[in-house]
């Protein structure tokens, strides 16, 4: 079949697009750069008025020019009905009154989405910090609220999503008044690290409306000493929580369906061999209604060290956890026994530390357990009572220990229907056709299986 060369000529096809399309295209660029297109031709001169997103970053060009550019842009778009999102990223220290005037303009114009980020400390006046139209708000870095937030005041009656990244508050009460001032808030994202020096998040989230909560909290040692955690969120459906173990938990999470936990034990306490600190018992009771639970390897260790009584997870259908060669599986048998309706078990890597307390969920046997094996070999394996139908293993490298653990699973999980194994090797690592991947998969396929319905797949 012959091909015809299509002569596109020198026609400017982009300029011939409808205004609405060009406005969408310009909205994808930083506004500083998008404004440069106005010099291309008369066709492009006024297209900036059609953008629906203002993305302003003073890292480009002259600092004074940037401030003047923001003033001119906001004035130019004073009557625009298309702009819905405003993003301001200040790499330099700008005049606080000028920045506040920009933010006030955004609130007055009825924008739907506001993103504020700065590398320096910038004060936000609380007297005008309110909007009836804002749906999404993100505050990052050095922006902080100055003044008092009156309790009971509604600041953002329509706000659905709030993200606070290293945002500092005068005190805990001010933070809670801010959250309470968002009565229909559905999604809250909190990110704090130990670089924060001033008062920040203190472990409290209380809201009747929040449905999704993401927390990454890495407190300084000073703040950790008095660390307590309170989640009073009865409508919460999804929780992603990463922090050090707290001294105490008070939770109301009756609607929770999925939890992703990365709870860590302070390294300085481990290094100093101090007494066990922290208690996750009430936290686990509070999330015992979940259907899906994801655990980091650190969480396994904390559950083992800091939980007095493990609750029964009657609704748990999917359990996922990560392994680490320096952390044992001591708590895994207890988790499996306390999950009577578990259907899917997901494990990221089978390599873990061999201990005397991994129980019969593990095929690894320490020297001490070998001596006691004869007296315990008749004990019922916790895997044999599991209702698990789907087993997902990732990071599988085919070592002798891993193969032994795979055998242990296949021989004891009686209800298995599907096993998905993610092999972590290159398909061909050697010359002369020696396929290591094939040898690993063949070894797994040759393992005996208790369930005749069990099918093994590789990815």
UniProtKB/Swiss-Prot annotation:
Residues annotated as signal peptide: none
Domain F-box: 11-63
Keyword Repeat: yes
Gene3D superfamilies given in the database record: 1.20.1280.50, Ribonuclease Inhibitor
Ligase among keywords: no
Domain of life: Eukaryota
LRR repeat spans: 66-90, 140-164, 166-192, 216-243, 292-323, 324-349
Keywords: Leucine-rich repeat, Repeat
InterPro entries to which the protein is assigned, alphabetical: F-box-like_dom_sf, F-box_AtFBL13-like, F-box_dom, FBD, FBL60-like, LRR_dom_sf, LRR_FXL15/At3g58940/PEG3-like
Protein name according to UniProt: F-box/LRR-repeat protein At2g29930
Source organism of the structure: Arabidopsis thaliana (Mouse-ear cress)
């Amino acid at each position: 079949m012959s091909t015809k060369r299509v002569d596109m000529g020198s026609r400017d096809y982009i300029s011939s697009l409808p205004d609405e399309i060009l406005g969408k295209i310009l909205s994808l660029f930083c506004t500083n750069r998008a404004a440069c297109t106005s010099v291309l031709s008369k066709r492009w001169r006024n297209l900036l008025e059609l953008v629906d997103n203002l993305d302003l970053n003073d890292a480009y060009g002259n600092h004074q020019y940037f401030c003047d550019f923001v003033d001119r842009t906001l004035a130019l778009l004073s009557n625009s009905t298309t702009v819905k999102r405003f993003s301001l990223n200040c790499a330099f220290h700008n005049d606080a009154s000028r920045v506040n005037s920009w933010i006030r303009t955004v609130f007055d114009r009825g924008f739907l989405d506001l993103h504020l980020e700065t590398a320096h400390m910038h004060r936000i006046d609380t007297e005008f910090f309110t909007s009836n139209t804002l749906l999404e708000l993100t505050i990052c870095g050095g922006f902080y609220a100055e003044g008092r937030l009156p309790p009971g005041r509604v600041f953002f009656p329509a706000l659905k999503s709030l993200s606070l990244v290293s945002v500092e508050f005068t005190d805990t009460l001010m933070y809670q008044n801010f959250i309470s001032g968002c009565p229909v808030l559905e999604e809250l994202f909190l990110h704090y690290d130990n670089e924060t020096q001033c008062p920040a998040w203190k472990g409290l989230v209380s809201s009747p409306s929040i449905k999704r909560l993401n927390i990454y909290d890495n407190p300084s040692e000073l703040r950790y000493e008095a660390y307590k955690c309170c989640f009073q969120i009865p409508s919460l459906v999804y929780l992603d929580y990463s922090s050090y173990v707290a001294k105490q938990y008070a939770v109301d999470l009756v609607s929770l369906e999925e939890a992703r936990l990365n709870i860590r034990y302070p390294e300085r306490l481990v290094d100093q061999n101090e007494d066990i600190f922290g208690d996750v018992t009430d936290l686990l009771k509070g999330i015992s209604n979940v259907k899906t639970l994801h655990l980091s390897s650190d969480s396994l260790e904390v559950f083992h060290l800091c939980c007095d009584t493990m609750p029964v997870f009657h609704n748990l259908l999917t359990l996922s956890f990560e392994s680490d060669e320096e952390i044992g599986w001591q708590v895994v048998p207890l988790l499996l026994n306390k999950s009577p309706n578990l259907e899917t078990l997901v494990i990221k890597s089978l390599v873990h530390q061999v201990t005397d307390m991994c129980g019969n969920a593990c095929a690894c046997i320490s020297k001490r357990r070998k001596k006691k094996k004869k007296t315990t070999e008749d004990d019922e394996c916790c895997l044999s009572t599991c209702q698990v139908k789907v087993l997902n293993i990732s990071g599988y490298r085919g070592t002798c220990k891993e193969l032994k653990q795979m055998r242990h699973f296949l021989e004891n999980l009686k209800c298995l229907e599907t096993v998905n194994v993610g092999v972590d090797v290159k398909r061909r690592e050697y010359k002369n056709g020696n396929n290591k991947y094939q040898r690993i998969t063949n070894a797994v396929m040759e393992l005996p299986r208790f369930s005749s319905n069990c099918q093994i797949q590789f990815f």
